[in-house]
């Protein structure tokens, strides 16, 4: 039926597919419907609800509404920390997205703080040489640059480059 949890899962996947195709308006619409179903069936603080909140927050960010992105990601982070803990990889993904939202809103100090936490989780769970760690290093380096610490930015981006070249090659 229209409100069945499996329908919610399909709506989530379809929303993410639209996001991959660059249609963030459709992504947002499908994820909003999915969120309504998940909140109704699982509750407002269920891990599945948290995952959809993360995706929906990022959809809002892709649409340029960083305030809504931050709000959805903040809710998602609370759920993930409660259910998975403060150092779980899924928590780290949301921390990274929330850090980038804060950066888009111009609060580079908060961006740095959230990305630093995300980096600690990435290094612990994936290792210091993993591409996920490299992506977080890139974002964190840019945050430091926005704060005016170009030496720190250079160091972090150099580490990210080494990881990327190791995993993807120099070409």
Regions found by a protein language model. Name each.
Residues 1-8, 42-50, 84-92, 126-134, ...:
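Helix N-cap/loop-to-helix boundary motif
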Residues 12-13, 48, 54-55, 90, ...:
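"A position-specific structural signal for the A-helix of alpha-solenoid helical repeats
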